[in-house]
Amino acid sequence: MLKMEKELCDYLKVALQVDPTIDRPGVKNKPAQSVYERYVQLQACKYVDEILVYETELDLLNLIKTQTFHIRFLSEEYKDVDVTGKQYCIDHGVEIHYHLRRHTYSSTEIRNRVYELEKAKREEKIEENLSQYSPKLLDKYMDK
């Protein structure tokens, strides 16, 4: 995605939100990684020229209003959604490019996979621990 975006511009600025649950608790997920960890990952990407960190949607709007840029990249899922700064971009001649999401990766899906793997690991450990006890002792406690 960042590679494709970089091919469409000379200088790629990426906005990194500290925690989307600040403005939208219950709607967005809290990041599993710290803002520093996510920043370092973006910094390591050869397509990213600058990283702009923001906390709230108001901060994002202020970034949009004060930064110089000619194209804004959004995922196609936001095409018919009134996202922060969209109208400002339209009013000020900033092209909005909607990129296709050709993959199924999502932070929610990754969280669910990790949860299921950890759950299976815990269940396996419980079964291992139970197997060390005699069946009669187990039966005594299982009947209760």
Predicted regions and their residues:
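Nucleotidyltransferase catalytic core that binds NTPs
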Residues: M1-K144
